[in-house]
Amino acid sequence: MLLKSTTRHVRIYTAEIQKNELIPSETVLTLDVDPDNEFVWPEESLQKVYRQFDALVESNSGEDLTEYNLRRIGSDLEAFIRDLLQKGELRYNLDSRVMNFSMGLPQMDHPDSQGAYLQ
């Protein structure tokens, strides 16, 4: 049975991809990061997300594979991506088909704004 977790920027499936189709699996998780290309992803930042995903999956080993547990992993990854954005390790894709700034408005450093807003 195919289980999934879907957030704005993270999709997790209990499936393998074969010939562009999801094939349900009880032993494989497939991660799709930022399917709408809302962000510009430096390779290093994307690899950080993959490593965080691996760590979250490992920390849940031995737990039942349920939609609830997948949603927890997805929510934790979503928070991790927000943290990367706030640290400036990735940025919004201004050529994205939708500009909704789902993780907050972009912030630019400017001498006049030093200390004028909370991080």
UniProtKB/Swiss-Prot annotation:
It comes from the Bacteria. GO terms for cellular component: plasma membrane-derived thylakoid membrane. It is found in: Cellular thylakoid membrane. It holds the Pfam family NdhM. Keywords: Membrane, NAD, NADP, Plastoquinone, Quinone, Thylakoid, Translocase, Transport. Its EC number is 7.1.1.-. The keyword Thylakoid applies. Its main location: membrane. It catalyses: a plastoquinone + NADH + (n+1) H(+)(in) = a plastoquinol + NAD(+) + n H(+)(out); a plastoquinone + NADPH + (n+1) H(+)(in) = a plastoquinol + NADP(+) + n H(+)(out). It is a peripheral membrane protein. The keyword Acyltransferase does not apply. One of its GO terms (molecular function) is oxidoreductase activity, acting on NAD(P)H, quinone or similar compound as acceptor. Belongs to the complex I NdhM subunit family. NDH-1 can be composed of about 15 different subunits; different subcomplexes with different compositions have been identified which probably have different functions. NDH-1 shuttles electrons from an unknown electron donor, via FMN and iron-sulfur (Fe-S) centers, to quinones in the respiratory and/or the photosynthetic chain. The immediate electron acceptor for the enzyme in this species is believed to be plastoquinone. Couples the redox reaction to proton translocation, and thus conserves the redox energy in a proton gradient. Cyanobacterial NDH-1 also plays a role in inorganic carbon-concentration. This is NAD(P)H-quinone oxidoreductase subunit M. It comes from Picosynechococcus sp. (strain ATCC 27264 / PCC 7002 / PR-6).
